[in-house]
From Swiss-Prot:
Protein name stated in the entry: Ubiquitin-NEDD8-like protein RUB2
InterPro entries, per database record: Nedd8-like, Ubiquitin-like_dom, Ubiquitin-like_domsf, Ubiquitin_CS, Ubiquitin_dom, Ubiquitin_ubiquitin-like
Cleaved propeptide residues: 153-154
Domain (Ubiquitin-like) ranges: 1-76, 77-152
Any further remark recorded for this protein: Ubiquitin is encoded by 16 different genes. Ubiquitin is generally synthesized as a polyubiquitin precursor with tandem head to tail repeats. Often, there is one to three additional amino acids after the last repeat, removed in the mature protein. Alternatively, ubiquitin extension protein is synthesized as a single copy of ubiquitin fused to a ribosomal protein (either L40 or S27A) or to a ubiquitin-related protein (either RUB1 or RUB2). Following translation, extension protein is cleaved from ubiquitin.
A GO CC term attached to the entry: nucleus
GO biological process, one term: ubiquitin-dependent protein catabolic process
Organism in which the protein naturally occurs: Arabidopsis thaliana
Taxonomic lineage from the root: Eukaryota, Viridiplantae, Streptophyta, Embryophyta, Tracheophyta
């Protein structure tokens, strides 16, 4: 099937894909056509950033759908947040982002309110007002998400 990828400059790229193709595959096809490295590509559909390991079918992307391509400038950092179920959520951050901002990004993707999130990195619980840089969180870092149960103090 054919899908379209629209860039911020307004250019539209036509791609031949299968619904079983992963977002990784689509980014590789964009690289073949446009020379843009996959790690600088962000694909958006229906207002959501598409995750690399998912397929077009996972996002209900059908023939003649239009994806939007946003380029990620170097300096942005891709980290992962791992849940207790083992699910990994990819989040694009800046070193100056606060932990609270990272929790907001987790909420955007997973619907978990920041107040219920505890983020752990290098064995430490992260304080909301500190930045990624304060904890030396960099590209490829994996944070662990633990949910704080509702209720009073123990």
């Amino acid at each position: 099937m054919q899908i379209f990828v629209k860039t911020l400059t307004g250019k539209t790229i036509t791609l031949e894909v299968e619904s079983s193709d992963t977002i990784d595959n689509v980014k590789a096809k964009i690289q073949d056509k446009e020379g843009i490295p996959p790690d600088q590509q962000r694909l958006i559909f229906a207002g959501k950033q598409l995750e690399d390991g998912r397929t077009l079918a996972d996002y209900n992307i059908q023939k003649e759908s239009t994806l939007h391509l946003v380029l990620r400038l170097r300096g942005g950092t891709m980290i992962k947040v791992k849940t207790l179920t083992g699910k990994e959520i990819e989040i694009d951050i800046e070193p100056t982002d606060t932990i609270d901002r990272i929790k907001e990004r987790v909420e955007e993707k997973e619907g978990i309110p920041p107040v219920q999130q505890r983020l752990i990195y290098a064995g430490k619980q992260l304080a909301d007002d500190k930045t990624a840089k304060d904890y030396a969180i960099e590209g490829g870092s994996v944070l662990h998400l633990v949910l704080a149960l509702r209720g009073g103090l123990l």
